[in-house]
UniProtKB/Swiss-Prot annotation:
Annotated residues for binding of Mn(2+) 2: K256, D261, D280, E341
GO-annotated cellular components: cytoplasm
Gene name of the encoded protein: pepA
Enzyme Commission numbers on file: 3.4.11.1, 3.4.11.10
Keyword ATP-binding set for record: no
Name listed for the protein in its UniProt record: Probable cytosol aminopeptidase
Key words, A-Z: Aminopeptidase, Cytoplasm, Hydrolase, Manganese, Metal-binding, Protease
UniProt superkingdom: Bacteria
Co-factor note (free text): Binds 2 manganese ions per subunit.
A GO biological-process term: proteolysis
Active site per database record: K268, R343
Function description: Presumably involved in the processing and regular turnover of intracellular proteins. Catalyzes the removal of unsubstituted N-terminal amino acids from various peptides.
Family matches, as PANTHER family: CYTOSOL AMINOPEPTIDASE (PTHR11963:SF23), LEUCINE AMINOPEPTIDASE-RELATED (PTHR11963)
Amino acid sequence: MTFQAIATHPQDWTGDTLALGLTTAAIGETLSSELQKLDQQWNGVLQELISDSEFKAKLAETTTTRIGGSIRKLILVGLGESPTTEDYRRAAAAVAKQARSFKSQTLAIAFPPSDDPAAIASAIVEGISLALYKDQRFKSEPDTASGPSSIELLGLAGQEAAIARAEQVVAGVELARQLVAAPANVVTPVTMADTAQELAAELGLELEILEADECEKRGMGAVLGVAKASDLPPKFIHLTYRPESTPRRKLAIVGKGLTFDSGGYNIKGAGSGIEMMKTDMGGAAATLGAAKAIGLIKPDVEVHFISPVTENMISGRGMHPGDILTASNGKTIEVNNTDAEGRLTLADALVFADGLGVDAIVDLATLTGACIIALGDDIAGLWSPSDDLAEQLLQAGKAAGEKLWRLPLEEPYLDGLKSPVADYKNTGPRAGGSITAALFLKQFVKHPVWAHLDVAGPVWSDKEKHYNPAGATGYGVRTLVNWVLS
């Protein structure tokens, strides 16, 4: 699938399928002057289609007809009243799915002129590419239906750089989707490390992988406590992108990487969704996806991508409820729930990131069911002691169409994590569980410019939503990239 930005006007374009994005104002009591010209050229087909289908131009609403002659199919897609970048993205996705159903080979898409044509071009590329993504690695009879092979963005000549960057971001999202969607017998700590090695070789990134013995030398008792029960070795991944010039800032992204979470001795029972615990490395997947995108884009920012990758399994040598672990900053943790293991692995990863001398740290993790209860499946939780960093992430998420909601770091809640035998317990009272999880992590990062994202809900969708097919969404990659580039 190739994208090309051209200056051609819709009335001059010829090809398989033409899509027009229309606002509600454009089809009010009378068609806009531009649409009237098209309607005259097409012998009234446009007005007839709008009237007969009762098309209202609601966001992502579509209607179609055959024109004949130089254009086989016409798609009208609604943009609503005042379209945002995310609206353009969703409208483009709706067009892509219609074009695929028509088996269109060439597609042209025209949206109204904008003050930010680069944003529109990027949104079209992202919306179409992400909507048409298919993961058929594990299908014995793959679905051969595909979308258009050639897509032209009308009226957007000169936006080649925006198209290229959007394609680079999409490549990162697709990597994250593939990692999250694959089962735990395919994606393991070992294969995650292999993926990091491939990224390093492909993109010229620096790579450091700490094996279990090195983790032990560094006092990473929290991550090693989780890893003990698995037959597969843990892999502590540290990828670094360094620009050729002096970086304008240095950042660290830390992703939780549990390739499977059985719950340990606090095993996940029936109805717990244990079969979906392959997704418990969604934070690490987004981290590696962001590494791919950043490595392709090559901004003037130094970025460290960190993920402690392991399984949380059950065996005779496994972590027991009641065990006390010592993290690499010397703080001790009473494990009162072996199924709250992600925060243990992140504890050592945050201490590691804290020692890199970066300007800001962001971690993301499929950390708590409590966050899903609070915010639902589509919204990630955000905690940060830094108002500036929180605002940066909120704006990055808004631009990406990835929803974030800031929640409080309510310090009095930390009392619920105090242990009579260690510094902290790894879980507190049931109420406010996502807040106490964030407070737990805060004990392992001294840096004041730090944020925690709980992405437990949006890394997976059971049904198709906009440009996300059912399954892994790749959530977080686009927000992280926007943040790094900001």
